[in-house]
């Protein structure tokens, strides 16, 4: 059994990494929906920020999420596509980019850091989301977007 808490973050939509590094404040603003899954217990829980691939969220992702919950970890699903009125980027990788999803992940991290139920925060992703998890460890990005993640899995 687990609890789901929904929250939103104010994010940005940079087209490419260069825009994060040079002019993030001039990129379009967007509100991104997130779902925080909490395992049984009191916490604080380690948390995995989870990012989908180009097909968006699929049923098999829930198997991984359930595994993390069963292991006592919280999971934060970020809905980067739906929040931008996109279902998939399989045929158009430019409609939602990994740069946009990077900002979403760091903005969600900022909110989670304030939650007393959450301890250390890692990041994981599938396919496109894995690219985000990889770039989230790059120091120039971390210096601009916020605190580093405690773990990375892509």
State the predicted function of each range.
Residues 1-42:
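N-terminal cap/lid segment of alpha/beta-hydrolase-fold proteins
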